[in-house]
């Protein structure tokens, strides 16, 4: 069933049926103030941290509530409804609604009983408060009197676990006050710092554009003994002007609109963590409500559409266009900002950045905003320990040069991460390379950056120490040890077990460093010898003719042998053998074909097969999951991006695009009940063929899938591959395509690219025509590019 459609011109996803299989969400705000809102106005808000800065309460794993609720009441009849379908949930044959999720804003338009409402939710650029503008229009030919209620359920404590669990304490530290047109909540804790370093917490919920007629700061008074669909205050037609003192706080404000026939009026609810003086200043800002809100919304749209304009494509597949031009890109920015911190699935327990997650997330925006990417990349380099490993969790309060590490009990106790992971620092190599290649800024390699615990070094030195960490943590076969994890958090191989996946990552890193250190002949010689030795081990110990094994247990037993009854075929070693250029052309063809035959489904490639049921070992923690789920034979979506890239690198355009289409959210827009989560954002995994719910996706928005699929599509399918010398354009596309166009900004220069595929090839173009001059396909040196360029790629 279809619940909505892509409006690519507006860069919006439009939900026409609000009764979706799961809450379909959008993200608002910035790193300083974040908000999640669904098509039914569910969701929550937080300052800096979803764990330690929670403002709005949200109850996870239930029915998408509470949220940002606006209720409308006909004062003549007493009938009432909500501006979004839920929480009141009027019958959809009489209640018409449409939700437009845009780039950092959401608007819900509804009609009921001759009244049209528009609820616009957004966080202004650079602000740390949110706006809920509500406009109400009388569509009838008679006067109407409409009561409007805004409801925000405030947390009793910024740490969400304290708010939801430690109620014997938190319900007795909060109280509310009413000031001129706003409710103020006070939390009497001054001994714990806020995420921004201040102490004490005050929140406000205010009304601009209308006069408050009644209010309450007590949840129990607003709801009564009912639920959100029938609040007692709305039934009564007003709040009782009571305030909270020991209990559950809320902000509830009511006002009345008198509308003539065809008349429209508007107001706005405002929410933030502010003192009374700051709240008054914000309230004054909206004295000219309509002009201010319109200006702020347009500023948001200009910013985000400007960010997305740095790459624009037009292909024969409109779902592909919608994902690459808008939704995959916007999701990449969202994961870049919030990592895995706060969603409707990630409850906010992680109070920081996962190292591997964030370094990979940076790659997803590199082609759109490389300088923003650089800022976060520099931050993550400063979270690298002096011996080369990355901190598994980088705290929001990270203080480079002064951090504890997994070698310290205090770090383990605070973060829950007991050891280093084999892959963390190796993700720096593709990410640093992508930055240098996208910008041409080789001087970045000489920038001095502190390490997390002690010492400083250039970016180049940071990378050298990452290689050294891998080389000093080798297993019995001379391959990198798997340590506490090797990207797959369910594969714990320790100091003696070895990872083929990480070995190919290391091989990739060694070859990148040869380019970065070309003026250091002795070090380049070491890199060459090390890479040659490692590749020899991989071919002699890990290649079984049609596949690379997954690695070795600490007992020396093989993981992922073709002779194994379970877990005999794994995806990532095959993809990374190709991406790292470790596989020969002949090997690449064979191993990719084996992956296709053994792992592919209508919904994407399964991570490994057959799933573990009986033959697992102690380090194979994926056995905890049901077969066909997550790392145990599920379609883990992040590796789909690597598979897309691998197929594209060998010129398999048909299969690269097949893999994109099979797991793409947009492919399920007409079959949304199967996929369940949003058809405009990637999920973490899809249930595999062993599940009775094959094709169902989970863990929306905050996932590394966003960046890997973006890279796979941009560098692989579209073939846009910046190098340190210039840019290569080598598409790998469906042979049936006649061609497509792209517009890209590269090092400040505009590229207008037309791909001509009248020969109906899958990949490997024959030649380019650059500004009227023919040249062989390959890298276009930067010095050959004008400020504005027309490039024709002949396949």
Give the label of every model feature segment.
Residues 769-773:
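Short strand-turn-strand beta-turns centered on an Asx-Gly dipeptide
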């Amino acid at each position: 069933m279809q619940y909505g459609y892509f409006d690519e011109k507006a860069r919006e996803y439009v939900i026409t049926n609000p009764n979706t299989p799961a809450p379909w969400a959008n993200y608002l705000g910035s790193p300083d103030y974040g908000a999640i809102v669904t098509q039914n106005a569910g969701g929550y808000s937080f300052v800096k941290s979803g764990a330690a800065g929670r403002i709005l309460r949200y109850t996870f794993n239930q029915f998408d509530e509470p949220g940002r609720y606006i209720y409308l009441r006909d004062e003549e009849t007493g009938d009432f409804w909500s501006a979004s379908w839920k929480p009141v949930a009027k019958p959809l044959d009489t209640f018409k609604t449409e939700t437009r999720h845009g780039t950092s804003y959401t608007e819900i338009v509804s009609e009921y009983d001759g009244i049209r409402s528009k609820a616009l939710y957004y966080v202004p650029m650079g602000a740390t408060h949110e706006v809920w503008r509500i406009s109400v229009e009388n569509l009838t030919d008679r006067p109407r009197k409409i009561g409007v209620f805004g409801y925000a359920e405030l947390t009793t404590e910024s740490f969400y676990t304290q708010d939801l669990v430690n109620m014997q304490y938190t319900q007795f530290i909060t109280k509310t006050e009413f000031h001129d047109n706003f409710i103020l909540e006070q939390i009497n804790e001054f001994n714990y710092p806020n995420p921004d370093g201040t102490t004490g917490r005050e929140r406000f919920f205010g009304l601009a554009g209308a006069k408050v007629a009644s209010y309450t700061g007590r949840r129990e008074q607003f709801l009564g003994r009912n639920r959100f669909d029938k609040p007692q205050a709305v039934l009564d037609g007003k709040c009782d002007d009571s305030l909270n003192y020991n209990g559950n706080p809320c902000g509830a404000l009511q006002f009345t609109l008198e509308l003539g026939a065809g008349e429209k009026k508007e107001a706005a609810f405002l929410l933030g963590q502010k003192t009374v003086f700051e709240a008054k200043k914000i309230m004054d800002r909206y004295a000219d409500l309509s002009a201010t809100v319109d200006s702020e919304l347009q500023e948001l749209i200009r910013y985000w559409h400007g960010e997305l304009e740095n790459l624009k494509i037009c292909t024969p597949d409109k779902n592909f266009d919608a994902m690459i031009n808008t939704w995959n890109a916007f999701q990449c920015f969202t994961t870049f900002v919030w990592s895995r911190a706060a969603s409707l699935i990630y409850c906010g327990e992680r109070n920081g950045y996962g190292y591997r997650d964030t370094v990979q997330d940076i790659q997803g925006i590199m082609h759109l905003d490389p300088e923003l990417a650089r800022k976060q990349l520099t931050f993550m380099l400063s979270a690298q320990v002096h011996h080369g490993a990355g901190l598994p969790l980088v705290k929001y309060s990270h203080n480079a040069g002064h951090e504890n590490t997994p070698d310290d009990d205090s770090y383990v106790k605070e973060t829950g991460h007991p050891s280093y992971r084999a892959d963390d620092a190796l993700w720096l190599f593709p990410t640093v390379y992508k930055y240098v290649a996208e910008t041409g800024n080789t001087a970045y390699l000489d920038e001095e950056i502190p390490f997390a615990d002690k010492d400083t070094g250039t970016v180049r030195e940071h990378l050298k120490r990452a290689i050294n960490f891998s080389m000093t943590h080798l297993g019995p076969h001379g391959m990198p040890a798997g340590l506490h994890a090797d990207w797959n958090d369910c594969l714990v191989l320790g100091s003696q077990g070895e990872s083929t996946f990480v070995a190919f990552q290391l091989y990739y890193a060694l070859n990148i460093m040869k380019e970065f250190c070309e003026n250091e002949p002795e070090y380049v010689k070491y890199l060459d010898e090390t890479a040659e030795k490692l590749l020899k081990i991989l071919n002699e110990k890990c290649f079984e003719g049609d596949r690379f094994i997954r690695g070795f247990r600490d007992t020396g037993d093989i993981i992922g042998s073709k002779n194994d009854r379970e877990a005999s075929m794994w995806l990532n070693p095959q993809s990374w053998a190709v991406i790292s250029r470790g596989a020969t052309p002949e090997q690449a063809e064979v191993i990719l074909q084996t992956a296709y035959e053994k792992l592919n489904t209508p919904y994407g490639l399964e991570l490994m097969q057959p799933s573990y049921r009986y033959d697992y070992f102690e380090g194979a923690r994926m056995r905890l999951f049901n077969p066909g789920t997550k790392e145990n034979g599920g379609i883990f979506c992040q590796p789909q991006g690597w598979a897309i890239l691998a197929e594209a690198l060998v010129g398999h355009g048909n299969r690269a695009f097949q893999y994109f289409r099979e797991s793409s959210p947009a492919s399920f827009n007409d079959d949304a009940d199967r996929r369940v989560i949003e058809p405009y954002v990637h999920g973490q995994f899809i249930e595999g063929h062993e599940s009775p719910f094959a094709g169902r996706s989970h863990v929306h928005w905050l996932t590394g899938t966003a960046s890997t699929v973006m890279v796979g599509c941009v560098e692989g399918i579209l073939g846009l591959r910046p190098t340190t010398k210039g840019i290569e354009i080598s598409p790998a596309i469906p042979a049936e395509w006649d061609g497509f166009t792209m517009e890209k900004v590269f090092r400040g220069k505009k590229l207008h690219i037309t791909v001509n595929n009248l020969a109906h090839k899958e990949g490997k173009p024959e030649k380019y025509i650059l500004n009227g001059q023919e040249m062989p396909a390959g890298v276009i040196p930067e010095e050959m590019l004008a400020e504005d360029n027309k490039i024709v790629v002949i396949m």
